[in-house]
Amino acid sequence: YLWGASAEGEGILLYTLRCAGGREVRLSNAGAAVTGIFAAGADGRPEALTPVFETPEALLADYADRGKTLCANRYGFGQRIWQSRVETDRIVMELPAGDDGLPVMAVLFDLDDDGQFAVTHLARGATAAPFTMTTQLFWQGDWRPTLRTQEGPATDDGRFYPVEGWRQNILGEAARLDDPAAGRTIEILTSQPEIRIVRHDGQLALLCGDSRPTPLDDETLYCQKDVYRF
Protein backbone atom coordinates (compact mmCIF):
# COMPACT_ATOMS: atom_id res chain seq x y z
CA TYR A 1 0.00 0.00 0.00
CA LEU A 2 0.99 3.66 -0.32
CA TRP A 3 3.20 4.45 2.66
CA GLY A 4 4.23 8.01 1.84
CA ALA A 5 6.09 10.13 -0.69
CA SER A 6 9.65 11.29 -1.25
CA ALA A 7 10.66 14.95 -1.31
CA GLU A 8 10.40 14.73 -5.11
CA GLY A 9 6.84 13.37 -4.93
CA GLU A 10 7.66 9.75 -5.75
CA GLY A 11 5.32 7.22 -4.16
CA ILE A 12 6.84 5.17 -1.33
CA LEU A 13 5.19 1.76 -0.99
CA LEU A 14 5.12 -0.81 1.81
CA TYR A 15 4.76 -4.53 1.10
CA THR A 16 4.30 -7.50 3.43
CA LEU A 17 5.28 -11.12 2.78
CA ARG A 18 3.82 -13.72 5.16
CA CYS A 19 4.33 -17.45 5.62
CA ALA A 20 3.49 -20.29 8.00
CA GLY A 21 4.35 -20.01 11.68
CA GLY A 22 3.49 -16.33 11.96
CA ARG A 23 6.60 -15.19 10.10
CA GLU A 24 6.49 -11.90 8.25
CA VAL A 25 8.80 -9.69 6.18
CA ARG A 26 8.01 -6.05 5.43
CA LEU A 27 9.60 -4.31 2.45
CA SER A 28 9.67 -0.85 0.90
CA ASN A 29 10.69 0.47 -2.49
CA ALA A 30 12.52 3.26 -0.65
CA GLY A 31 16.06 1.92 -0.78
CA ALA A 32 14.70 -1.50 -1.85
CA ALA A 33 14.71 -2.06 1.89
CA VAL A 34 13.68 -4.65 4.44
CA THR A 35 11.77 -2.58 6.98
CA GLY A 36 11.11 -5.40 9.45
CA ILE A 37 11.27 -9.17 9.93
CA PHE A 38 8.98 -10.81 12.50
CA ALA A 39 8.56 -14.29 13.97
CA ALA A 40 6.17 -15.61 16.60
CA GLY A 41 7.44 -15.43 20.17
CA ALA A 42 6.83 -17.89 23.00
CA ASP A 43 3.39 -16.34 23.60
CA GLY A 44 2.49 -16.51 19.92
CA ARG A 45 2.76 -12.78 19.40
CA PRO A 46 5.03 -11.43 16.65
CA GLU A 47 8.51 -10.39 17.75
CA ALA A 48 10.81 -8.18 15.67
CA LEU A 49 14.08 -9.85 14.70
CA THR A 50 15.40 -6.77 12.89
CA PRO A 51 15.13 -3.01 13.34
CA VAL A 52 11.60 -1.92 12.40
CA PHE A 53 10.96 1.29 10.48
CA GLU A 54 7.45 2.55 11.21
CA THR A 55 7.51 5.48 8.76
CA PRO A 56 9.20 6.20 5.41
CA GLU A 57 10.77 9.27 6.95
CA ALA A 58 12.54 7.14 9.56
CA LEU A 59 13.74 4.75 6.87
CA LEU A 60 15.14 7.45 4.58
CA ALA A 61 16.72 9.31 7.51
CA ASP A 62 18.68 6.21 8.59
CA TYR A 63 22.11 6.93 7.13
CA ALA A 64 23.44 3.64 8.50
CA ASP A 65 21.36 2.20 5.61
CA ARG A 66 20.05 -0.68 7.74
CA GLY A 67 17.98 -3.07 5.67
CA LYS A 68 18.69 -1.26 2.40
CA THR A 69 20.11 -2.44 -0.90
CA LEU A 70 23.59 -1.03 -1.44
CA CYS A 71 25.68 -0.69 -4.58
CA ALA A 72 29.46 -0.74 -4.06
CA ASN A 73 30.42 2.29 -1.97
CA ARG A 74 28.11 4.82 -3.60
CA TYR A 75 27.11 7.43 -1.05
CA GLY A 76 23.37 8.03 -0.80
CA PHE A 77 22.38 5.01 -2.90
CA GLY A 78 20.12 3.79 -0.11
CA GLN A 79 17.91 6.88 -0.52
CA ARG A 80 16.74 5.97 -4.03
CA ILE A 81 13.11 5.13 -4.75
CA TRP A 82 12.85 1.93 -6.81
CA GLN A 83 10.14 0.89 -9.25
CA SER A 84 8.29 -2.04 -7.69
CA ARG A 85 5.61 -4.62 -8.39
CA VAL A 86 4.11 -7.88 -7.10
CA GLU A 87 4.61 -11.10 -9.08
CA THR A 88 2.42 -13.76 -7.43
CA ASP A 89 4.26 -14.31 -4.09
CA ARG A 90 7.35 -12.32 -5.07
CA ILE A 91 8.18 -8.63 -4.71
CA VAL A 92 10.30 -7.19 -7.53
CA MET A 93 12.11 -3.86 -7.32
CA GLU A 94 13.97 -2.29 -10.25
CA LEU A 95 16.11 0.70 -11.17
CA PRO A 96 16.70 1.68 -14.80
CA ALA A 97 20.20 2.41 -16.07
CA GLY A 98 21.16 5.99 -15.34
CA ASP A 99 23.62 8.65 -16.43
CA ASP A 100 25.65 7.89 -13.30
CA GLY A 101 27.23 4.85 -14.95
CA LEU A 102 25.10 2.26 -13.17
CA PRO A 103 23.46 -0.62 -15.07
CA VAL A 104 19.86 -1.82 -14.94
CA MET A 105 19.33 -3.34 -11.49
CA ALA A 106 16.68 -5.47 -9.81
CA VAL A 107 16.11 -7.08 -6.41
CA LEU A 108 13.77 -10.04 -5.98
CA PHE A 109 12.30 -10.82 -2.54
CA ASP A 110 10.76 -14.25 -1.79
CA LEU A 111 9.49 -15.90 1.41
CA ASP A 112 8.43 -19.56 1.51
CA ASP A 113 6.52 -21.56 4.13
CA ASP A 114 9.74 -23.05 5.47
CA GLY A 115 10.78 -19.58 6.63
CA GLN A 116 13.38 -19.07 3.92
CA PHE A 117 13.66 -15.40 2.98
CA ALA A 118 15.55 -15.06 -0.30
CA VAL A 119 17.04 -11.85 -1.69
CA THR A 120 18.31 -12.00 -5.27
CA HIS A 121 20.35 -9.14 -6.77
CA LEU A 122 20.43 -8.77 -10.56
CA ALA A 123 22.14 -6.29 -12.89
CA ARG A 124 22.92 -6.02 -16.59
CA GLY A 125 24.98 -3.48 -18.50
CA ALA A 126 28.59 -2.37 -18.77
CA THR A 127 30.13 -0.39 -15.91
CA ALA A 128 33.41 1.49 -15.82
CA ALA A 129 33.84 0.98 -12.08
CA PRO A 130 33.87 -2.27 -10.08
CA PHE A 131 30.30 -3.34 -9.36
CA THR A 132 28.69 -5.20 -6.49
CA MET A 133 25.29 -5.28 -4.76
CA THR A 134 24.21 -6.39 -1.30
CA THR A 135 21.39 -5.96 1.21
CA GLN A 136 22.60 -4.68 4.56
CA LEU A 137 20.29 -6.63 6.84
CA PHE A 138 20.81 -5.94 10.55
CA TRP A 139 19.47 -8.17 13.34
CA GLN A 140 18.54 -7.07 16.86
CA GLY A 141 18.79 -9.24 19.94
CA ASP A 142 21.46 -11.20 21.78
CA TRP A 143 22.77 -12.95 18.67
CA ARG A 144 26.00 -14.93 18.61
CA PRO A 145 27.40 -15.01 15.06
CA THR A 146 29.52 -17.78 13.57
CA LEU A 147 30.96 -17.49 10.07
CA ARG A 148 31.81 -20.56 7.98
CA THR A 149 35.13 -19.55 6.43
CA GLN A 150 38.04 -21.16 4.65
CA GLU A 151 40.05 -20.42 7.80
CA GLY A 152 37.56 -22.24 10.05
CA PRO A 153 34.71 -20.85 12.19
CA ALA A 154 35.13 -17.10 12.79
CA THR A 155 33.45 -14.66 15.15
CA ASP A 156 35.60 -11.52 14.71
CA ASP A 157 34.17 -8.27 13.35
CA GLY A 158 35.36 -6.12 10.52
CA ARG A 159 37.15 -7.86 7.70
CA PHE A 160 35.75 -9.99 4.91
CA TYR A 161 36.33 -13.73 5.22
CA PRO A 162 36.26 -16.14 2.25
CA VAL A 163 33.22 -18.43 2.54
CA GLU A 164 34.07 -22.08 3.17
CA GLY A 165 33.60 -24.24 0.07
CA TRP A 166 32.51 -21.29 -2.09
CA ARG A 167 31.90 -22.03 -5.76
CA GLN A 168 30.79 -19.47 -8.33
CA ASN A 169 27.01 -19.30 -8.89
CA ILE A 170 26.37 -21.93 -6.19
CA LEU A 171 24.35 -21.14 -3.06
CA GLY A 172 26.14 -22.38 0.05
CA GLU A 173 25.98 -22.13 3.84
CA ALA A 174 27.95 -19.12 5.03
CA ALA A 175 27.00 -18.31 8.63
CA ARG A 176 24.54 -18.69 11.46
CA LEU A 177 23.18 -16.58 14.28
CA ASP A 178 22.22 -18.15 17.61
CA ASP A 179 20.21 -16.59 20.41
CA PRO A 180 20.25 -19.26 23.17
CA ALA A 181 18.00 -17.33 25.53
CA ALA A 182 15.28 -16.95 22.91
CA GLY A 183 15.91 -20.39 21.43
CA ARG A 184 16.28 -18.95 17.94
CA THR A 185 18.68 -19.75 15.12
CA ILE A 186 19.08 -17.99 11.78
CA GLU A 187 21.06 -19.63 8.99
CA ILE A 188 22.55 -17.55 6.18
CA LEU A 189 23.29 -18.96 2.73
CA THR A 190 24.90 -16.97 -0.08
CA SER A 191 26.33 -17.18 -3.57
CA GLN A 192 28.73 -14.35 -2.70
CA PRO A 193 32.39 -15.27 -2.13
CA GLU A 194 32.89 -13.45 1.18
CA ILE A 195 31.12 -12.52 4.39
CA ARG A 196 31.84 -10.26 7.34
CA ILE A 197 30.30 -9.11 10.61
CA VAL A 198 29.22 -5.46 10.86
CA ARG A 199 27.91 -3.90 14.08
CA HIS A 200 25.92 -0.71 14.60
CA ASP A 201 24.26 0.58 17.77
CA GLY A 202 24.02 -2.84 19.42
CA GLN A 203 22.79 -4.57 16.26
CA LEU A 204 24.73 -6.74 13.84
CA ALA A 205 24.69 -7.67 10.18
CA LEU A 206 26.30 -10.61 8.43
CA LEU A 207 27.18 -8.83 5.21
CA CYS A 208 27.60 -11.07 2.16
CA GLY A 209 29.72 -9.52 -0.56
CA ASP A 210 32.92 -9.33 -2.53
CA SER A 211 35.85 -7.19 -1.39
CA ARG A 212 37.45 -7.38 -4.86
CA PRO A 213 34.64 -6.73 -7.35
CA THR A 214 35.23 -6.17 -11.06
CA PRO A 215 33.41 -4.01 -13.65
CA LEU A 216 30.54 -5.55 -15.60
CA ASP A 217 30.53 -5.96 -19.37
CA ASP A 218 27.55 -5.89 -21.76
CA GLU A 219 27.37 -9.68 -21.97
CA THR A 220 27.38 -10.51 -18.26
CA LEU A 221 24.29 -10.90 -16.08
CA TYR A 222 25.21 -10.06 -12.50
CA CYS A 223 23.29 -12.44 -10.21
CA GLN A 224 23.89 -13.00 -6.50
CA LYS A 225 21.53 -14.52 -3.95
CA ASP A 226 21.31 -14.52 -0.16
CA VAL A 227 18.92 -16.72 1.84
CA TYR A 228 17.99 -16.27 5.50
CA ARG A 229 16.34 -19.24 7.25
CA PHE A 230 14.53 -18.09 10.38
Task: Show where each model-derived region lies.
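An exposed, glycine/acidic-rich loop-and-rim segment of catalytic or binding clefts
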Residues: 1-230
